[in-house]
Amino acid sequence: MAQNVYGPGVRIGNWNEDVYLEEELMKDFLEKRDKGKLLIQRSRRLKQNLLRPMQLSVTEDGYIHYGDKVMLVNPDDPDTEADVFLRGDLSLCMTPDEIQSHLKDELEVPCGLSAVQAKTPIGRNTFIILSVHRDATGQVLRYGQDFCLGITGGFDNKMLYLSSDHRTLLKSSKRSWLQEVYLTDEVSHVNCWQAAFPDPQLRLEYEGFPVPANAKILINHCHTNRGLAAHRHLFLSTYFGKEAEVVAHTYLDSHRVEKPRNHWMLVTGNPRDASSSMLDLPKPPTEDTRAMEQAMGLDTQ
């Protein structure tokens, strides 16, 4: 069987068929390019939406309100386990499947989640505090109240909800095999979450109090009573690289207190810079630092 190992311009064997084949391939390529169906075009659109800069809500009274745009951040803790591979503050991010994102123009449902070292608000890590039963936009979120966490991912007219459900043999997290956390477009009881005070001895006393912004809290799933947790020691190979796993599981120490894996902050926007968050503000000096500055004559107050 004759085979043309040269280009179509060299007429060897069934050269006429090779020429028509090259023309058909070029027509197919140009048609996909005009319709925006090339893999590189779909990948570019997806990254453009997920990495689109977002603006967080700025709190005036120091509390979280329904309708606020926030980032869910697992704060860094120096006393965590030694086997972690990601240090620093980790923000909760949506993580679409790499293969499915190339096959479709829209986000896949359900969509995965991960924790990333990202302090800048973008489309994949900016969540919206939503009410469950009625429109309560502008009202203060309180401890013990049900709420939903929605995310658009930088897309227009698209809303996915943070959800979780009981673990089964066919449905669990990829690395730890614990209860899975995912994003879905269906509104149901698996979308409901509650904020709890970190100290268990004061938890009941704080029931009904406003949830402070940029402070450590617990986020518990109402249906399964599991806490949102970040696994810094388990990584996932995602569309954007290696990122930490996120599950719904409550970790308790010997004193029956939730571990830092379950600690989260609802981070709001920086009033000085609309494109940044409160994590970018410098921390105030401690009393020891102030005393040292005064002793050295460096007190600027």
From Swiss-Prot:
Domain of life: Eukaryota
A cellular component annotation (GO) from this entry: motile cilium
Location(s), subcellular: Cytoplasm, Cytoskeleton, Cilium axoneme; Cytoplasm, Cytoskeleton, Flagellum axoneme
UniProt record, GO biological process: cilium assembly; flagellated sperm motility
InterPro entries per the UniProt record, alphabetical: CF161
This protein's record includes keyword Metal-binding: no
Annotated region (Disordered), positions in chain: 269-301
Coiled coil: none
Tissues expressing this chain: Expressed in airway epithelial cells.
Signal peptide interval: none
Keyword terms of this UniProt record: Cell projection, Cilium, Cytoplasm, Cytoskeleton, Flagellum
Subunit structure: Microtubule inner protein component of sperm flagellar doublet microtubules.
Function comment: Microtubule inner protein (MIP) part of the dynein-decorated doublet microtubules (DMTs) in cilia axoneme, which is required for motile cilia beating.
Name used for this protein in its record: Cilia- and flagella-associated protein 161
Annotated organism of origin: Homo sapiens (Human)
Gene encoding the protein: CFAP161
